[in-house]
């Protein structure tokens, strides 16, 4: 689709607005950083638990070192039929819409008959 004049104009105006407000935004960010370095984390500790970055990194390293089969494998009890994508209860996946189900059922239904031999060429 082509870009409309309205969208081009809006994009242009947003760019000009960003250019105009850039110095104010930079000053605001600097003040936030300056305040942040002096303030203790006591206020934040009441709201959420503060965990040092080292502990998180160590935990991530342990997960990476673990064998692939143990940590990354999901516990799925449902077994799907690869041919028709139904699970053991006859349900299709959530992402499989009605049209796709109908098409798949019709394709599976066609194949149930007796197979015929190919016609031979008459020379």
UniProtKB/Swiss-Prot annotation:
Organism of derivation: Xenopus laevis
Compositional bias segments (type: Basic and acidic residues): 70-89
Sample GO molecular function, one term: basal RNA polymerase II transcription machinery binding
Family as reported in the entry's similarity comment: Belongs to the learning-associated protein family.
Protein name: Protein LLP homolog
Biased composition regions of type Basic residues, renumbered to the chain: 1-21, 100-123
GO biological process terms on file: dendrite extension; positive regulation of dendritic spine development
Gene name for this UniProt entry: llph
Pfam families, alphabetized: LLPH
Principal localisation: nucleus
Region annotated Disordered, chain positions: 1-22, 61-123
Subcellular location: Nucleus, Nucleolus; Chromosome
Lineage: superkingdom: Eukaryota
UniProt cross-references to InterPro entries, sorted A to Z: LLPH-like (IPR018784)
GO cellular component, one term: chromosome
Keywords noted in UniProt: Chromosome, Nucleus
Biological role stated in the UniProt entry: Regulates dendritic and spine growth and synaptic transmission.
């Amino acid at each position: 689709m082509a870009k409309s004049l309205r969208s081009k104009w809006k994009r242009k105006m947003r760019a000009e607005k960003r250019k105009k407000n850039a110095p104010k935004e930079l000053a605001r960010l600097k003040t936030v950083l300056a305040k942040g370095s002096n303030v203790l984390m006591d206020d934040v500790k009441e709201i959420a638990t503060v965990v040092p970055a080292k502990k998180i990194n160590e935990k991530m390293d342990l997960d990476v070192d673990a064998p692939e089969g143990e940590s990354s494998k999901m516990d799925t009890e449902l077994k799907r039929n690869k041919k028709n994508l139904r699970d053991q209860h006859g349900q299709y996946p959530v992402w499989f819409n009605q049209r796709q189900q109908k098409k798949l059922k019709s394709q599976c239904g066609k194949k149930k008959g007796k197979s015929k031999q190919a016609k031979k060429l008459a020379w």
